[in-house]
Amino acid sequence: MAGNSIGQLFKVTTFGESHGIALGCIVDGVPPNMALSEADIQPDLDRRKPGTSRYTTPRREDDEVQILSGVFEGKTTGTSIGLIIKNADQRSKDYGDIADKFRPGHADYTYQQKYGIRDYRGGGRSSARETAMRVAAGAIAKKYLREQFGIEVRGYLSQIGNVKINPETVADISKIDWQQVASNPFFCPDPVAVEGFGELIRELKKDGDSIGAKLTVVAENVPVGLGEPVFDRLDADLAHALMSINAVKAVEIGDGFDVVEQRGSEHRDEMTPQGFVSNHAGGILGGISSGQPIIAHIALKPTSSIMVPGRSVNLNNEQVELITKGRHDPCVGIRAVPIAEAMTAIILLDHLLRFKAQCR
């Protein structure tokens, strides 16, 4: 399995499985002399960790991160930073039933066909539990971006199923109520939508089913010039990073698929001596950041781990009926907000370091 790393100058490599002893990552390229401790990383992990609300999986993990290397006397040394999180609340017995069966909609079938072996306990390496280390690495990137460049990377949930936020609450990026986002379990800026989300999730849990979601990531104060045309365009790398998150099925930059119905006279972001008039492009032009806020949206599918019986096959290609046991999120999009922030921050810092290495 060769796809465990992302980034060039700021590079993150993760390892570990859902029901293994621990999860870990190596972060290369962190500049020296940045103050760093576990306390800088833990808050983002706490936002992602399971068992924090009645709307997510009941699996409980403290997700306490430990820095193993790359920090001396409270400051980064410029060498590889090793991070580890111990797994604690595994219940592997929940998965004994599917040792020889493929959960429909999961990676079970493709992992088995590709490698001839798979860790069936909670999905092993294919589990979203792996993303804890992305969030840990992303917290380091977010701290450096904020302290050295004033760049803020934040996200919010905009839709679960057919319940959407009022678009007026996010029409002006500079006026998004980030305190409201931080104060509810859905990372949502619209208190009315929060009520609707809660009602929908309670209904789904009663039915033993799941639902998809859409979320948005906003990066503010990004300077002009990030991105390496033609193949390493900033939007291409962002799409790559965001699509690598479990359950993500679509990525939009700026207006995304809405551009299909727009005319050129509407979509083009006109300019005046005072700056851009609009931001349909989502802060990226020609694969290079324009200095406007970078806006990306992702859509996540409903998890296939549900209590509703479904048809599948076993290792012998025989028909079976499957009900997924274990503890699962009714909507994986809820805990994906800090993950999407992390992946965005990792890409932005990587491109900032590349920009500094070759440009004025």
Swiss-Prot record:
Cofactor annotation: FMNH2
Record's cofactor remark: Reduced FMN (FMNH(2)).
EC number: 4.2.3.5
GO MF terms, alphabetically ordered: chorismate synthase activity; FMN binding
GO-annotated biological processes: amino acid biosynthetic process; aromatic amino acid family biosynthetic process; chorismate biosynthetic process
Pathway note: Metabolic intermediate biosynthesis; chorismate biosynthesis; chorismate from D-erythrose 4-phosphate and phosphoenolpyruvate: step 7/7
Residue spans crossing the bilayer: none
One GO location term (cellular component): cytosol
Binding site for FMN: 125-127, 246-247, 286, 301-305, 327
Record-linked Pfam families: Chorismate_synt
Substrates-to-products reaction catalysed: 5-O-(1-carboxyvinyl)-3-phosphoshikimate = chorismate + phosphate
Keywords from the named record: Amino-acid biosynthesis, Aromatic amino acid biosynthesis, FAD, Flavoprotein, FMN, Lyase, NADP
Function: This reaction introduces a second double bond into the aromatic ring system.
The protein's name in its UniProt record: Chorismate synthase
Organism listed in the record: Actinobacillus pleuropneumoniae serotype 5b (strain L20)
Classification of source organism: Bacteria, Pseudomonadati, Pseudomonadota, Gammaproteobacteria, Pasteurellales
